[in-house]
């Protein structure tokens, strides 16, 4: 099967972030990285549950914390938890595209749906200067991040536009070109950072992410060297022979 077909079989579409709940550890890492604190008004878009709001209020003492999600069951359950624990967070059930986030100082935004991202981009561009938007894995489309602690990325208003996809990619990885070691390092950071109970084989997912990172870099012309590294070739063969997961066609597309 093609790699895209395999990704669709993963629990909660794990690799893309769709409907995945961040761990408490991840929230704390993100909040420390973005320097969340008492003056801040924090929004978690697509919150899914109350956990990020609870930690923002109880541990980081934010001025205000709001979670928004369009799943009524999840929002209702999250509200009940906050009420039971007497935590003054706000939880709103609506589509984030329709939400008023104009007072935000820090926003957590982890979506992969292009239509949602593109609609929100216009909304973000109208936010007040210095507002921080945290994304995971990559920055906002066509933008250069303000700060990176991979896989966590801070985008700051006003957004800085990238001159090219290559410039954007290199701003994330901090290297002039992406080799196997770089791809593996960042894939491992991602897998460990978003670790959930569904991840039973970190190494397996790290291999998949490594191949995705390197092949994307190759397509963008920022992979180190012209030849495919031996390690990449080995893992591509391993995926095909042992798991019937095909990456080779992606390289063929690149060479056309």
For each predicted feature, which ranges?
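Conserved SAM-binding loop of SAM-dependent methyltransferases across substrates and taxa
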Residues: 51-62
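Conserved SAM-binding strand-loop segment of SAM-dependent methyltransferases
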Residues: 85-96
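C-terminal substrate-binding/active-site "lid" region of AdoMet-derived donor-dependent transferases
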Residues: 115-173
